[in-house]
């Protein structure tokens, strides 16, 4: 009898121990179920954030249109495996229309920006650029962008970066202005060989717009890599016909203390004419290598 009771007691203790172990396992499983996903979700979001591709926006200049950036985009597609995923058209009233489909699986997504009013003032186009960047973030979660601009698209990008960009804006990672008139335009407020760049990079003559940029220079985002491309017809004007080399190169003095990397490339000869620069294969290669290599 005693032997029988001992056996029952042993079985009871074993049963209790098994139940306790089971309860502990359930508690531990439940805890992990509700706690672990918080960490994993955070890790997944971080991975997704870091893996999100960086789209490149192409912005035309004064009197420009989609043809102004077609060759640049096609060359990126053919040479670097990039793909145009969106075209954003902006009405004269600032309303945006998105054509195409965003695809986060594309390694080098390209976005073509077209202003239907291609004679709008710089602040207006910069405001439209702000709208686009905000919508890209809200719609697709885009947190970083590159910008390639031709002509007035350069000052438009600069105005946005200095005056309209905020902490919620996508971070400007790379900027490639082509033929950017940052300190005057020939036939408007500049004359060939009137201005020059000092050894320290400062332009001798500064127009009103440039002075306003200079006052806001500390608002240019840090860490941007810049490739500034400009043309020289080699006809004695030191210009691309519309933009003097001094006007284009004056950008450096504005942002030199803010950027992570800055370089300039002069294109020479007949194909360095202002409107031909965006049809120039040398320019295509420079832009593509800078953006995608």
Name the predicted role of every residue range.
Residues 1-12:
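N-terminal Lys/Arg-rich, disordered targeting/topogenic segments
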Residues 3, 19-20:
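Short, low-complexity Pro/Thr/Gly
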Residues 10-16, 22-148, 152-293:
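Lipid deacylating catalytic domains
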């Amino acid at each position: 009898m005693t032997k029988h009771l001992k056996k029952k007691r042993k079985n009871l203790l074993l049963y209790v121990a098994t139940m306790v172990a089971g309860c502990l396992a359930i508690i531990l499983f439940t805890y992990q179920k509700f706690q672990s996903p918080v960490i994993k979700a955070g890790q997944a979001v971080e991975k997704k954030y870091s893996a999100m591709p960086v789209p490149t926006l192409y912005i035309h200049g004064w009197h420009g249109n989609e043809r102004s950036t077609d060759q640049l985009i096609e060359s990126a597609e053919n040479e670097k495996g990039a793909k145009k995923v969106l075209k954003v058209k902006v009405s004269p009233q600032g309303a945006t229309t998105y054509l195409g489909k965003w695809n986060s699986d594309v390694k080098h997504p390209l976005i073509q920006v077209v202003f239907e009013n291609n004679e709008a003032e710089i602040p207006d186009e910069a405001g439209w650029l702000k709208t686009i960047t905000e919508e890209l973030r809200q719609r697709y979660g885009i947190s970083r962008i590159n910008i390639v601009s031709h002509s007035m698209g350069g000052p438009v990008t600069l105005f946005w970066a200095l005056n309209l960009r905020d902490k919620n804006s996508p971070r400007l990672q790379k900027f490639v202005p082509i033929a950017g008139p940052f300190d005057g335009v020939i036939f408007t407020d500049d004359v060939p060989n009137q201005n020059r760049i000092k050894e320290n990079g400062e332009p001798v003559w500064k127009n009103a717009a440039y002075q306003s940029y200079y006052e806001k220079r500390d608002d240019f985002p840090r860490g941007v890599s810049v490739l500034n491309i400009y043309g020289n017809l080699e006809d004695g004007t030191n210009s691309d016909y519309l933009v003097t080399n001094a006007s284009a190169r004056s950008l450096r003095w504005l942002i030199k203390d803010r950027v992570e990397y800055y370089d300039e490339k002069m294109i020479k000869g007949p194909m360095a004419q202002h409107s031909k620069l965006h049809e120039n294969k040398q320019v295509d290669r420079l832009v593509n290598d800078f953006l995608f290599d």
